């Protein structure tokens, strides 16, 4: 926050709306072009920006910086404008204060992406964006605080998990300053001295900064930064993945090891990365045809349902259950002499798979982003020309992107980085969990990491479908 240029910008109270406004305008353009523009996906801004450029930029920003998309989220700008006229009256139901709804929506989006071929449909893509805006207005129109962000938004949950590997975090500079603070404006909000009205809100995601650990559930909204009267909160550097190696109690979250909903989110994040990539390689068609014949299922939804059930439920239960059983058998009792329960073991070590899952998302999304890097230019030229003012010239449809052989090297690098990260995290968990026998506790999870990494490597070497571009693959 003290970086020349950037520091003053982020400390400015209206920095977030300034970043949100361009993305809101871009979202409106995407919706209009998706509904009324060309029906061919590679010539439409909705599909090109959504499925090629946005996803690639998103994962790269998460890797290199942090959850800055949530900071600039255009949906929240619309929500904030609506709240000037309609104040939410209800608190989010206690029974739903978990990730189960967002996990389900995450799976639904992955499923719909394949079933409706969203990458090839500007119309469906536009309505997906519209649906997102409407969902935000409905949820946060009725419920206080940032209920949509914390409990509903599937994109936000993806960002939360991925940002555990980011090099920056919103956190306090000096704990002593927080200890001496009596107002706790970072969570309560800053109040006017006379009227006692909140002039700058505190954290709407219930993350009390002195007890906050890591990036989980943090949208980088900077409300706490602006509310703090001591300028004691900033965007500070940290060791990526460090928050995955320990299990302290976390403000607004609790213990990772006791959150089965968070574990389910991590499972969908990791195994969903492989599943999403599997949907674009040629062997998927052979598998779908074989399943359709074997199960006598004609509709694609039924076949996809079987593939999703195996990939997101059966496979994780089998692999993680086996690894937890071997860890219990090889590592013996805990350091306190208590026998190890199977489910808590699986829950605790599952977080070690996050780097590998993120490596697969990086490899997959950057493949599309880099190979179609320049496709935005002719699509924009064509969109401008359709308005009768072709001042950008004729569309240059021959523009593509980085050669695929170079991109493949980058993909391998991401996967190697993900494997290394997962091995380091799982070994750190093993040392903490079994200080006397860390290697025995570590080996089953190292084997799981190796299996998933080999599957990821196999995927990136398959012929891939060049979705949302005019290229063939």
Labelled PLM ranges:
Residues 217-218, 229:
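A membrane-cytosol interface segment of integral membrane proteins
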Residues 1-185, 201, 207, 225-226, ...:
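Membrane-embedded alpha-helical bundles of multi-pass integral membrane proteins
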Residues 213, 223-224:
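A short, cysteine/histidine-rich metal-binding "knuckle" motif
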Residues 66, 212-215:
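Conserved short loop/turn motifs at secondary-structure junctions
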Residues 190-213, 232:
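Solvent-exposed, extramembrane regions of membrane proteins
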Residues 190, 221-222:
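Alpha-helical membrane segments and immediately flanking helix-loop junctions
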């Amino acid at each position: 926050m003290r970086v020349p240029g950037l520091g003053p910008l982020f400390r400015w109270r209206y920095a977030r709306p300034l970043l949100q406004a361009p993305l809101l305008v871009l979202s409106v353009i995407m919706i209009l072009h998706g509904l009324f523009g060309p029906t061919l996906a590679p010539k439409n801004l909705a599909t090109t920006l959504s499925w090629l450029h946005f996803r690639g930029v998103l994962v790269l920003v998460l890797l290199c910086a942090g959850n800055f998309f949530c900071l600039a989220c255009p949906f929240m700008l619309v929500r904030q404008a609506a709240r000037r006229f309609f104040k939410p009256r209800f608190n989010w139901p206690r029974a739903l204060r978990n990730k189960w709804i967002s996990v389900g929506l995450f799976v639904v989006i992955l499923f719909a992406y394949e079933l409706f071929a969203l990458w090839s449909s500007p119309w469906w893509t536009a309505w997906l964006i519209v649906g997102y805006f409407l969902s935000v207005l409905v949820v946060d129109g009725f419920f206080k605080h940032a209920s949509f962000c914390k409990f509903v938004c599937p994109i936000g949950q993806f960002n939360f998990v991925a940002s555990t590997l980011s090099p920056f975090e919103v956190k306090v500079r000096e704990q002593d300053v927080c200890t001496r603070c009596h107002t706790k404006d970072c969570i309560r909000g800053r109040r006017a001295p006379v009227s006692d009205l909140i002039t700058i809100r505190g954290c709407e995601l219930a993350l009390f900064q002195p007890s906050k650990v890591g990036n989980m559930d943090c949208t980088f909204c900077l409300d706490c930064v602006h509310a703090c009267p001591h300028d004691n909160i900033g965007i500070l550097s940290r060791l990526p993945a460090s928050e995955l190696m320990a299990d302290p109690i976390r403000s607004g979250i609790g213990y990772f090891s006791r959150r089965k909903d968070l574990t389910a989110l991590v499972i969908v994040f990791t195994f969903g990365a492989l599943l999403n990539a599997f949907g674009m390689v040629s062997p998927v068609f052979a598998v779908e045809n074989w399943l359709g014949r074997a199960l006598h299922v004609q509709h694609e939804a039924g076949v996809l349902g079987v593939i999703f059930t195996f990939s997101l439920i059966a496979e994780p239960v089998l692999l993680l259950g086996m690894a937890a059983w071997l860890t219990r058998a090889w590592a013996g009792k805990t350091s306190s002499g208590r026998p190890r329960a199977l489910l808590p073991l699986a829950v605790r070590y599952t977080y070690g798979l996050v780097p590998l899952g993120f490596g697969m998302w990086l490899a997959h999304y950057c493949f599309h982003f880099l190979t179609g890097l320049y496709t935005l230019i002719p699509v924009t030229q064509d969109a401008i020309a359709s308005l009768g003012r072709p001042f950008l010239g004729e569309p240059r449809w021959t523009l593509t992107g980085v050669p695929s052989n170079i991109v493949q090297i980058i993909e391998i690098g991401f996967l190697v980085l993900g494997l290394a990260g997962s091995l380091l995290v799982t070994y750190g968990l093993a040392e903490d969990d079994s200080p006397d026998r860390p290697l025995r506790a570590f080996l089953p999870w190292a084997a799981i990491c190796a299996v998933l990494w080999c599957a990821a490597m196999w995927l990136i070497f398959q012929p891939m479908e060049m979705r949302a571009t005019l290229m063939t693959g």
